[in-house]
């Protein structure tokens, strides 16, 4: 690879020459892709299959065991149904790549993981408490629900304007929390609709979510070890519930046995003329 000479550091004798790159000070933009291709090639050659929906998920399904590896840039989380296979995988990876181990997973990308004999509990308790503290609501009264059932938000054209930066910062922080908190997915989706021109009424309402979190920071997802593998899906909608344009909002979730594995809350793109049409 060749690069141009840095400005003001050109060689006076060869100003038009280029330099051959020995090592990039802060890495190259191609590095992540090269690393991913290198790791993918290694895993596929050893019997792993890459996920279709998640291209960073690799699964090795043998007759006697199951080994799963989840890749996030240069961090790899893996586990197996047989402990010896996980240990063997770790040793093989160390031979091929320079890497370090942190033993049992307890914290990953702000996710706190508690592993017990009965199952695994995933939460974002530390992150939730930081949100409450960040926006100065740790001393405020807790809210029993994330959104009011008696008052519906609207554009509020005549309302008092508030800082869009502050409002968007709250929405962004809360959206990241939905990774382990499906109970606030709908309410955040509703409040996120008013980021373009937030009013005081919107800010008061979105702070209610934070006050709700302040009372429930330790909520999370429990994945039972003894649950069956039956997949079940549920969905519903609130027909024409948006005051501004009468569009409906769809909600859905999927359970693998007793364990919640996927959920969504999304405003529909068009107006439905009946409940049946919305569904």
Q: What kind of region is each of these model predictions?
A:
Residues 5-6, 11-12, 52, 88, ...:
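Mixed-charge, polar/low-complexity N-terminal
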Residues 26, 31, 35, 57-61, ...:
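Divalent metal-binding acidic/histidine catalytic loops
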Residues 1-98:
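Metal/cofactor- and membrane transport-associated sequence elements
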Residues 1, 16-19, 37, 41, ...:
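Amphipathic alpha-helical interface elements that mediate macromolecular binding in regulatory proteins
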